[in-house]
Amino acid sequence: MVLVTAVRDYINRMIQDISGMKVLILDSSTVSIVSVVYSQSDLLKKEVFLVELVDSISMSKEPMSHLKAVYFLRPTSENIQHLKRQLASPRFGECHLFFSNILNDTQIHILADLDEHEAVLQVQEFYADFVAGDPCHFSLNISSNHLYMLPVAMDPSNLQHYCDRIVDGISAVFLALKRRPIIRYQRTSDIAKRIAQDTAKLMYQQESGLFDFRRSETLLLVLDRREDAVTPLLNQWTYQAMVHELIGIQDNKVDLRTFGKVPKDQQEVVLSSEQDSFFKANMYENFGDIGMNIKRMVDEFQQIAKSNQKIQTIEDMAKFVDNYPEYRRKQGNVSKHVTLVTEMSKIVEERKLMLVSQTEQELACNGGQGAAFEAVTTLLNNENVSDIDRLRLVMLYALRYEKESPVQLMQLFNKLASKSAKYKPGLVQFLLKQAGVDKRTGDLFGNRDLLNIARNMARGLKGVENVYTQHQPLLTQTMESISKGRLRDIDYPYVGNHFQPGRPQDVVIFIVGGTTYEESRSVALFNSTNSGIRFILGGTTILNSKRFLKDLEDAQRMIRSSSTVV
């Protein structure tokens, strides 16, 4: 049930069975789908000598009859139009058409009519309509991710398109896994309900034959990001999550071009658990351990190189790697990780993130409103704290104490307004309208449910291994409830008459509004406990705090510019 393997198998079947020199033609979505599971060198081994985008190849007229064209596209009307133009005067010796999802009858008829020159040798559906960045974590890379926060009446056409894309992605995941799930959703979310119902309609009515798989011990749970707005607001201190938070990961690639003196061969680096054994072993480790593990590998090479250079700091490691070009050649991966850790250390120091993060974790995990107010006020007054960190601190305080301390919250709003040029308190108030206590179902701060209160007290008494990684996403509680058969029907209703009496074997949790790498780490750790249930996490995009705040701003701007009353 590993998604990376499923997507890789589809691509293998596309390019392996077609012999000879090939051009692979993709669209803006499938280029991401392919790039996270297949490297350029992998493609060359399969005789793929050219990779082109379908919209740019439409503009070229140069004949290439020596190449066989392998198209892998989403079945959209735009792509059908591109094919219409290209098949009218074929440039390639053969055309093989693969679509990442279900073609409708109209599209099939259009394609049949287009092929006047009989250039098309096959048309197939290969259900890889999602970006499988990690074995149990996928994204749909939806750019207009803020739409889930809008009232239905505001932009019905774009919202429909947004929901359709999500249903397409979810259905492709289950077709790739050869499962038809029982479907549940978060009761307090209209958009989660809509997507759950649309998915059920597709799987149990419109395409019931296609989804007629025997095994049914599978659950799809559709959640809303606003149920836990804390997780995407926090600074991160485990490797993969920290890289995404401080630098950014897009399709398993990290762009370092804007960072000072980065070596040319490391301006863009790949972070893939499938292609990088060091990253695979360390992606969920905390920042301090990463530094030690890199140092251990540098020490090993130092012995081989018989160098006496003292290595005690991250800067020492960076200098050592620069001085030994053969080290970079032999241990390219390690020098890449030295670069990443070096750049992140600079950001941590510049933004005083150890100070900021300690207060964030206190806000997310522990009580004590008075102490929290003092700590946030002190940081708002600290000139070294950035505007984005000030905003996140006020948001975290507001999510936790909106009902308990409205007077102090107003004082923090005023302080934020005077200290931050970019961010205003209106965005915090908008967050509370979207994700405040009145909108939530679950026990986000572990202070409603008696069992959660006891658990938090026990954790406090035992002490926490790392003050910066105390927080656990709400998703962890949800997975525990599912594994114990205690996910409440009243909070997470079933769609239709399809119920699940026992525990599911496989669970796909889809978060409308996006996932985080902290949550994907929780899923991976949960899967490693051998509980008998395999979890997969998916979402509309992969968030860091910057992206989450941008989505909030985009939604707020649209609502303000509309005359619709929220």
Explain the meaning of each model-derived region.
Residues 1-566:
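Extended, well-folded catalytic/binding cores that form a central cleft or groove in large enzyme
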